[in-house]
Swiss-Prot record:
GO terms for cellular component: extracellular region. GO terms for molecular function: sodium channel inhibitor activity; toxin activity. This is Ikitoxin. Disulfide bonds join C18-C41, C27-C46, C31-C48. Residues 3-58 form the LCN-type CS-alpha/beta domain. Has the structural arrangement of an alpha-helix connected to antiparallel beta-sheets by disulfide bonds (CS-alpha/beta). Beta toxins bind voltage-independently at site-4 of sodium channels (Nav) and shift the voltage of activation toward more negative potentials thereby affecting sodium channel activation and promoting spontaneous and repetitive firing. Does not produce effect when administered to blowfly and cabbage looper larvae. In mice, does not produce convulsions, tremors, increased ventilation nor death. The keyword Disulfide bond applies. Keywords: Disulfide bond, Ion channel impairing toxin, Neurotoxin, Secreted, Toxin, Voltage-gated sodium channel impairing toxin. It is found in: Secreted. The lineage of its organism: Eukaryota, Metazoa, Ecdysozoa, Arthropoda, Chelicerata.
Amino acid sequence: ADVPGNYPLDKDGNTYKCFLLGENEECLNVCKLHGVQYGYCYASKCWCEYLEDDKDSV
């Protein structure tokens, strides 16, 4: 089964762009900022595993 998750949003409500697909240190840091431990770059946007619908932009 696919792991649930979401695209985190910044304070302006935008997704975080990324260029290095897969394991991506920038995305890991973004995901930790949003309170989850792991994420990666997918389709040029940071994706965070187990992130709820991201209503609280940071």
